[in-house]
A protein has these predicted regions:
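Repeated scaffold domains used in trafficking and secretory/extracellular systems
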Residues: 18-25, 65-76, 116-137, 175-192, ...
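Entry beta-strands of beta-propeller and related beta-repeat scaffolds
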Residues: 30-34, 79-83, 131-133, 141, ...
Length: 324
């Protein structure tokens, strides 16, 4: 695969009011929506709609059951939705509309909860080309990671939403899993494409990644029950030397997965790469002049979204790219 060369189209600037880009979507007309939070109060969440008309700030106001029960952003048709507490979807059919408030059903035929009552949503990026939306969760142990996932069936026309399944990923499929602990694989990002479910897995160790590095990472196709169908990427054991290693993965509104190394000391020297689910090849990313500190966030068609964080969110940029 050829390298990605980005050209700047549009830029939105911020004055450190917001924190990180937790998740993003790109609509076909180049409108972007990002999930972020207040820089000084990370429990105040916002959806920022970025278009040619400027920035529209949508406060996401609800009463969380804990400080880590995050809202979840997803793209659906020409609009977007926000999942609140695994109980309700706020669906915006377009960027100008008020949201439709759609309750989520969470019972089996035997009246059992599908998503456990104490499970907590994680805002990690999810992508889907269907009515089934994959969502990251944590359950039983709460460190801000995601070790579970659920599938939400959503229909904006019928205004219905219901949980279909709640699962963990089978660790035994991975070469470097650790049987000494019950920890299941962590999940960075989820994607559904052509009825296939994909997950990026940043290892399973509960130890601090910043302090010790990852134990392994992988990109896999999985079933709704968490069975590993295919390992597309699987790293070596990353704890075999005294260096720290690790790569995070983020699915996009395209065939590409954004790979971000955790440490600048690794073989990628801290530079992001893209990986194609179609060709199974890697590509380098070349940012426009003056934007070398930006991070790629999403890709759709020939458009991509980048962000700059420097003691707060400084810039969001819309670019096009060529890889011919």
């Amino acid at each position: 695969m050829n390298d990605f060369k980005l050209t700047l189209l549009r830029k939105w600037e911020f004055d450190n009011e917001f924190s990180f880009v937790y998740a993003s979507i790109l609509l076909p007309d180049g409108t972007a929506v990002i999930l972020t939070s207040d820089y000084t109060d990370w429990h105040k969440y916002y959806a920022l709609v970025l278009s040619t008309e400027g920035v529209k700030k949508i406060p996401i106001e609800y009463n969380p059951t804990s400080n880590r029960d995050y809202p979840v952003l997803f793209r659906y048709k020409e609009g977007f939705g926000i999942i609140i507490l695994a109980k309700e979807v706020w669906y915006y059919s377009d960027i100008y509309s008020s949201p439709a408030l759609i309750p989520i059903k969470n019972k089996t035929l035997l009246r059992y909860n599908i998503v456990p009552e104490k499970a907590q949503q994680r805002y990690f990026q999810n992508i889907s080309d269907s009515q089934i939306i994959p969502v990251c969760f944590e359950n039983e142990v709460y460190y801000g990671n995601a070790r579970c996932f659920a599938l939400l069936e959503f229909d904006d026309t019928a205004k219905t939403a219901k949980w279909k399944s709640f699962s963990k990923i089978d660790k035994k499929a991975f070469t470097h899993h650790d049987d000494r602990w019950a920890d299941t694989p962590k999940i960075d990002s989820l994607k559904i494409l052509d009825k296939r479910i994909y997950a990026f897995i940043p290892g399973e160790s509960a130890s601090s990644v910043n302090k010790w590095g990852m134990d392994y990472y992988a990109l896999a196709q999985i079933s709704a029950e968490g069975k590993v169908i295919e390992k597309i990427i699987e790293s070596d054991n990353l704890h075999t030397d005294h260096k720290k290693h690790g790569v995070n993965g983020c699915f996009t509104d395209s065939e590409y997965v954004i790979l971000t190394p955790v440490f600048k000391s690794d073989e990628w020297k801290g530079n992001q790469k893209v990986f194609s689910l179609t060709t199974r090849e890697y590509g380098n990313i070349f940012l426009p002049k003056g934007m070398t500190k930006h991070k790629l966030q999403n890709i759709t068609g020939n458009l991509c979204l980048t962000s700059l964080f420097d003691r707060g969110l400084k810039e969001i940029s819309l670019c096009n790219y060529s890889n011919s």
